[in-house]
Amino acid sequence: MAYDYLGLVNDINRRLNEVELTSSNFAATTGFDSFAKDAVNSAIRHIQQEEYEWPWNHAEEEETLTVAEPRYSYPNDAKTINMNSVRIKRNSTLNVGTVKLKNMTYEEYLEKYADAEYNTETKGCPTHIIRTPNRELICYPMPDKAYEMVYEYYRIGYDLISATDVPSIPEQY
């Protein structure tokens, strides 16, 4: 059986001696078939919420920093960001090597460097990265060039909708 939404729902239907669905009647289900579809998504959500950093949710983001802009939003699908993986990528044009950014707490940033966001004279190659409470990253000092920032994060799981949707969870799980 195919490892997609339709296949998983039909696994439930076969185990309970129900009629299997097809791709043509999958979208218009009612009753037990709708329950089976909900059960598949519920099981996937349960697995995804059990652990924050499943390997199949791992992703890498590259973001071009904007000159004099210290704040950057999380990716829309980010559950957690590995703050120890944030780095500036080597770029010979900008004359910069790979630089691992030091993690700083938001409270420490506010105590020591809060004025830096308003003082546009304080620019350079970022040396610190700060996670804010509102799902943003702050680069300190604010960039003076269009550096490439790279970091790793873990995605939020997603519900399956159409018959051919494939779960992000590997089949062996």
In which residue ranges do the predicted regions lie?
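Glycine-enriched, solvent-exposed interface loops adjoining structured elements
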Residues: 1-173
